[in-house]
A protein has these predicted regions:
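Conserved G1/Walker A P-loop phosphate-binding module
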Residues: 1-99
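Conserved P-loop NTPase architecture
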Residues: 1-26, 138-142, 146, 156-158, ...
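Canonical P-loop GTPase G-domain recognition
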Residues: 22, 165-211
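Charged, alpha-helix-enriched surfaces in structured cytosolic catalytic cores
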Residues: 31, 60, 115, 143, ...
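Conserved nucleotide-binding/hydrolysis micro-motifs of P-loop NTPases
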Residues: 58, 86-88, 137-139, 165-169, ...
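Flexible beta-alpha connector loops of hexameric P-loop NTPases
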Residues: 88-112, 137-138
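Conserved C-terminal guanine-recognition region of P-loop GTPase G domains, centered on the G4
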Residues: 108-183
Length: 211
């Protein structure tokens, strides 16, 4: 009987691994989404996903890395990482001028950034679990964060809050935890890798396949 039970567990684990989890990384601009995506991808595959930049909306299309096998606390999970364009309530092309981008290219970037936000919102229908990344040095109670979490809750999509940039002296990750106490919470530095193992624990514990 024990042998049979062991076989059943093996079969369950086998098919669980065959069902990849689509893990969407969402948040405002410049909260470290791409840095976090690169950290996860490099830790488990040795390869990064995209280019991180201090310029807002550097990621303007969904960037993907598929079939990443992560392991934590004796659990295995195969994920497809989806690094989403940064969300914003308003995009002003003049914001890009401060980074030495000429007016023509700034307007193009603003248009692409707007399209990227629309694409990211559409992808909410295709992700299984979301890492909602927030900058631990800033006020978490923004319209973007509140709207994002409200949409995820309405769609029944599991969420893990990630307070990023805890390596900064001004970081106050507890502000995020206290603002949204109903969600699983991890504080990390995607740049240095601090507490990243705690994030992998949370992903293997809370991520699930839609349906």
């Amino acid at each position: 009987m024990m042998v049979f039970d062991g076989f059943i567990n093996w079969v369950r684990n086998f098919f669980r691994l065959r069902q990849d989890i689509s893990l969407g990384i969402y948040g405002c601009t410049n909260v470290g989404k791409t840095t976090l995506a690169n950290r996860i991808a490099k830790d488990w595959t040795g390869e990064e996903i995209g280019k991180a930049s201090r310029i807002p909306h550097e990621t303007r299309t969904v960037q993907k890395k598929e079939k990443i096998l992560i392991q934590s606390n004796g659990k295995k999970l195969r994920i497809n990482i989806l690094d989403m364009p940064g969300l914003a309530t308003k995009i002003d092309y003049r914001k890009f001028l401060k980074f030495g981008i000429n007016k023509k290219n700034a307007r193009i970037r603003a248009k692409e950034a707007t399209q990227g936000i629309v694409e990211a919102i559409k992808w909410l229908n295709h992700v299984d679990t979301v890492l909602a990344v927030m900058d631990a040095t800033k006020d978490p109670l923004t319209q973007v964060n509140i709207t994002l979490l409200g949409n995820l809750e309405a769609k029944g999509i599991p969420v893990i809050l990630v307070a990023n940039k805890i390596d900064m002296k001004s970081a106050k990750p507890n502000n995020i935890k206290e603002a949204f106490p109903q969600y699983p919470f991890v504080e990390v530095s995607a740049l240095s890798g601090r507490n990243i193992d705690q994030l992998y624990d949370a992903i293997t514990k809370h991520a699930r396949k839609a349906g």
